[in-house]
Amino acid sequence: MTTPPRGPDGRPLKVRVKKSRGRTTSSQKWLQRQLNDPYVARAKREGWRSRAAFKLIEMDEKARLLKRGMRIVDLGAAPGGWSQVAAKKIGLEEGLGKIVAIDLLEIEPIPGVAFAQMDFLAPDAPERLIAMLGGQADLVMSDMAANATGHKKTDHLRIVGLVELAVEFARQVLAPGGTFLAKVIQGGMEATLLADLKRDFTQVRHVKPAASRADSAELYVLATGFRGEADRAETDDAGTDGTGTAEAQAPRDQ
């Protein structure tokens, strides 16, 4: 468990950011939150590139997502925290598995991780990724977020749209039985997204790791047991959710 630094009296120590003429109120609040975030401090101490690494670590502890020898695609990988975690978990240093990190932005190299600076929406992206992986992916994971506008409904719709694009990409690169994990923001459109995922995966649920800030609407959608195109066609013809279970689990710790 990650706890904030404490003073001699046992109370958490807080860093207060002084007001600056060139700094907006929102940026000042963000900076103060970062400075007082125990996960930010721990990430620096342990060598992770971002606090988001702990979100994947915690989700993996609960769902056993990362297995040795897996082939993984990390969408919107910058700055690389999730790829770092996955590399350790799948045994990349021992020559096991394969990870391809994709982003429009360049990232500092991660030992053993292949990087593709590209748009995953490019027509040739799925084919290129499968070639780089040496086969279909076992896991497509995404911690991507659209640029925030500050308008909750707009931000929700934008990230749901981004996840829908990631799902379409995953359909083209995942191996049967594969897993899809992506960040979303609550706001009302989750049901439609989950219904779409249930056509392709045997189980769909929401996950909110402890490292996600309690006051944040952020959560993750986890879909396991990818059916593949043939199984999906049979499911559609039958007019059911398939032989597996498909459930939407309400997020906790809101």
From Swiss-Prot:
EC supergroup of this enzyme: transferase
S-adenosyl-L-methionine among keywords: yes
Organism: Xanthobacter autotrophicus (strain ATCC BAA-1158 / Py2)
HAMAP family associated with the record: RNA_methyltr_E
Residue numbers binding S-adenosyl-L-methionine: 80, 82, 103, 119, 143
Positions annotated as active site in the UniProt record: 183
This protein's name: Ribosomal RNA large subunit methyltransferase E
EC number(s) reported in the record: 2.1.1.166
GO molecular function: rRNA (uridine-2'-O-)-methyltransferase activity
Its job: Specifically methylates the uridine in position 2552 of 23S rRNA at the 2'-O position of the ribose in the fully assembled 50S ribosomal subunit.
Chain spans, region Disordered: 1-28, 231-254
Biased composition (Basic residues): 13-22
Pfam families: FtsJ
Catalytic activity: uridine(2552) in 23S rRNA + S-adenosyl-L-methionine = 2'-O-methyluridine(2552) in 23S rRNA + S-adenosyl-L-homocysteine + H(+)
